[in-house]
């Protein structure tokens, strides 16, 4: 039996709501419904009664519940034990492409330069969207997440690493926002909430990407502008701030599981500055 089906069943039974279960599992509501139907088909019974928003366990669902909890608990314990033996020298760090390109690449270099303190440690630099990385962290498939948003789950520990400055850049001097096409570089959902006010409510991005390198290479060809970290843009050269734009300060957080068996290691690694300029 697919353990993901049992995991979904347990979440729906806990929340009594397909939408909230989908949010907790980082799935769509239709995916949650499909998984429950799959499990019901495998067992040949209905597990929930559905009357509008009132979702309840059937008698069969009530009987399955303790077995599902035991199976998932056993499975998680097995995964943890196997991971502990096979990954004791591995350490995975996840972040978006833009964060790796603009600042974390340099930090990774500093980690290797300080390897005397952690001899034999093997790093994995993982690139993905924040939502996917949060899920991996929750499932113990990732050791550390670096992101611009504070955690929203109680089981996570976090540390504010500092702040960095974003500015709107283009490839030629003395340009105004109205003269340029907008390239959206993803800096997190909370940044996008303010994006319309910073750019213009009617501005439709000509390109959306999670890669700062790609955005920087395209702005000249597309007569565009995009938000880039100031320290990174200065090192790149050939970039100019848009005249009628402002700057924006963004936080950077390290996030990990509170009960991670690598807590001490994580705190040691975070003693090495992640940002070149911390303020």
From Swiss-Prot:
Organism for this UniProt entry: Escherichia coli (strain K12)
Gene Ontology process terms (BP): negative regulation of DNA-templated transcription; regulation of DNA-templated transcription
Cystine connections: none
DNA-binding region: 18-37
Name of the protein in its database record: HTH-type transcriptional regulator HdfR
Reported function: Negatively regulates the transcription of the flagellar master operon flhDC by binding to the upstream region of the operon.
Lineage: Bacteria, Pseudomonadati, Pseudomonadota, Gammaproteobacteria, Enterobacterales
An example Gene Ontology molecular-function term: DNA binding
Keyword Acyltransferase (UniProt): no
Miscellaneous information on this protein: The expression of the hdfR gene is negatively regulated by H-NS.
Keyword Transmembrane helix attributed: no
Pfam families in UniProt: HTH_1, LysR_substrate
Family per similarity comment: Belongs to the LysR transcriptional regulatory family.
All copies of domain HTH lysR-type, residue ranges: 1-58
Annotated gene: hdfR
Protein keywords: DNA-binding, Repressor, Transcription, Transcription regulation
Coiled-coil ranges (or none): none
